[in-house]
């Protein structure tokens, strides 16, 4: 089994052993406390807590001796996908970005927002591989974060509890291995190749947690009560958008119909010049 950190204490010990300064370790601690609030109650289909995966991703990055800003970003890399900011909407907005900036600083936040915006699919991997040399420094760093994330997902075979993951590795694995090599991290490339090979040869795992969720999902305490405005306002907002879009389509169709009728009338014999 792998030796990467899965808890905050293990990560802090690793950072100290890897030579990160006390100031660096404090930055990571602050990000971890922020992550605890963002990802409370999140689990993977394997039953693994989401925060363990985040710590593992940061640990992979720390083992590569990257700047602490990248390690910190790795610890909250899914903020805009799965983070709960306490408001109506998730995702990237000026409000959520400001919260992340206040918690970890603008440089780390820039990594996180670029991570979320980077296209990531086996279909796009050949393009990324061919254009690595043309990427900016920060986008190369973000690409490395993406690779660290996918390695961590597979280290303990936890990815096998998710549907279609073998196909994902089969189609995208070779390109990811090549990307790590091209970025200048041969040890990461070799480890990814080894782990991906094991993933593809493993039999279905068990026992399985009793969930049908395909990806990260939320488990809340029984005492949890949903706030009305958080639950129903987004639904009302989506309904209003659907109604508005429907009205726009009807207006467009009606406008075309009226123009068509007017054109037909204008072309009828005897219409022009009639008094």
Predicted segments, located by residue:
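Active-site helical microenvironments for divalent-metal-assisted chemistry
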Residues: 1-275
């Amino acid at each position: 089994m792998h030796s990467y950190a899965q808890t905050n204490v293990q990560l802090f010990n690793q950072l100290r052993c890897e030579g990160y300064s006390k100031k660096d370790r404090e930055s990571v601690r602050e990000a971890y406390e922020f992550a605890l609030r963002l990802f409370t109650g999140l689990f993977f289909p394997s039953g693994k807590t989401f925060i363990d995966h985040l710590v593992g991703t940061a640990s992979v990055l720390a083992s590569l001796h990257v700047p602490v800003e990248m390690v910190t970003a790795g610890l909250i890399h899914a903020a805009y996908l799965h983070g709960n900011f306490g408001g109506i909407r998730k995702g990237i907005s000026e409000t959520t970005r400001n919260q992340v900036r206040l918690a970890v600083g603008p440089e780390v936040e820039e990594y996180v927002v670029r991570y979320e915006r980077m296209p990531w699919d086996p279909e796009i991997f050949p393009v990324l591989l061919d254009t690595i040399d043309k990427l900016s420094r920060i986008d190369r760093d973000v690409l490395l974060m993406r690779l660290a994330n996918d390695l961590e997902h597979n280290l303990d075979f936890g990815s096998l509890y998710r549907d279609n993951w073998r196909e994902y590795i089969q189609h995208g694995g070779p390109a990811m291995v090549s990307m790590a090599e091209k970025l200048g991290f041969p040890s990461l490339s070799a480890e990814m190749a080894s782990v991906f090979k094991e993933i593809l040869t493993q039999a279905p795992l068990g026992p399985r947690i009793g969930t049908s969720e395909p990806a990260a999902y939320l488990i809340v305490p029984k005492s949890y009560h949903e706030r009305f405005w958080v639950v129903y306002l987004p639904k009302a907002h989506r309904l209003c958008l659907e109604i508005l879009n429907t009205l726009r389509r009807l207006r467009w169709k009606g406008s075309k119909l009226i123009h068509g009728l007017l054109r037909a009338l204008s072309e009828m014999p005897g219409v022009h010049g009639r008094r």
